[in-house]
């Protein structure tokens, strides 16, 4: 019986480590090359991740599978009983605005975006804004001490190492 529980813990830990690694790699790729392909990889990797709007409302999003087995380019925000959809075109529009903001900045600098509407009058922007913050595309709070982008990657890496170490010691007896 103990072996079965250990296997489940190890399997769960491995899945979590793989998910964290996928998120880390997606963010690193996006920050190295701000392309729509890398943005989409981040969107896919972070689905189901607990997020908060600027006003503090919790939400997460999922991507649904299309007719031919691929993911649809529509984010389904799960905040209440009814889900709200955000189209890929809305995400792209906001992303293009971020890229325009970056043009006037020095290399590696992120645009400071005080409020979601500063990215444009785009449907679903209050849900897109925290995503861009989480991915490290924008700076939303100068006093945040870097809890996004590369810093998030490092935190995810640290968490996966910790989870791996925990999973390896849970089966040991003292």
Q: What do the predicted segments below correspond to?
A:
Residues 87-120:
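Short acidic, hydrophobic short linear motifs in intrinsically disordered regions
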Residues 119-134:
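Short amphipathic alpha-helical interaction segments
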Residues 112-114, 135, 151:
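Extracellular-facing segments of soluble proteins and assemblies that are Gly/Ser/Thr-biased and enriched
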Residues 133-144:
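A short, conserved structural fragment
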Residues 19-87:
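Long, low-complexity, charged/polar intrinsically disordered regions in eukaryotic proteins
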Residues 144-172:
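Short, cationic-aromatic polyanion-contact patches
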Residues 5-36, 161-174:
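Non-catalytic accessory regions used for complex assembly or targeting
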